[in-house]
Amino acid sequence: MIIWMTGCTNGLGRALVPEFVERGHTVVGCGRNEIELQRLSEEFPDCFFMACDVSDEGSVEDFVNEALISAGEPDFLINNAAIVNEPAPLWQVSAEEFNSLTSVNINGVANMIRHVVPLMLSNDSGMVINLSSGWGRSSSPDVAPYCATKWAIEGLNQALSQELPENVGTVALNPGVINTEMLQKCWGEEADSFPSAESWATTAAPFILGLTPKDNGKPLTAP
């Protein structure tokens, strides 16, 4: 299968790449860290990696066009790219930082869907995986902007599921609590007590690959 994934240069996305490849799939990935993208290209020469800012629709359009030429149409789209705010009460979060989160975490998902789902509709086949969060189903102090964006993804996913035909599906996937740079930013050393992204990916990858349009609309949590 051909798996398109955003945010592949670090965290959960970076950890999923080798797991998918080892299972015989082609990864088409994007991110903003060009050094890591080059490393990925060298490590996985049969895959395709390209710089892309998902919050910029023009950048997304360029990525989609190049990916189609280099790798082919997607069986899966994994909307993984996301950022978190510096922990602070909402009234101390600047408008610039708040807008940055919504641009990446919400607009970025919508931009990818806008350009990729029509390909799936044409093929009458495909799965969209929108990475959510436990903070998209609950809340916590000092991360209100992040919570807001992930609650938005849950609603977006539910509405999208009602718009798709029978053979195309979408799910909102809560990865669980994983020791990534984002969690360290929020929790500091406490994050070290949780599983690494690499450990998580060994069970998350087969779980994701097992999702089908029969799961359409479900709010799921990775094992």
Give short role names for the model-derived ranges.
Residues 9-10:
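Conserved glycine-rich cofactor-binding loop
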Residues 23-39:
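Conserved glycine-rich Rossmann-like NAD(P)H-binding loop of the short-chain dehydrogenase/reductase
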Residues 51-62, 95:
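The beta1-alpha1 cofactor-binding region of Rossmann-like NAD(H)/NADP(H)-dependent oxidoreductases
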Residues 88-90, 97-99:
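Substrate-binding pocket helix/loop in short-chain dehydrogenase/reductase
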Residues 113, 149:
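Active-site helix of classical SDR
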Residues 133:
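Residue(s) in the substrate-gating loop at a strand-loop-helix junction
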Residues 166-168, 172-173, 180, 189-223:
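C-terminal helical subdomain
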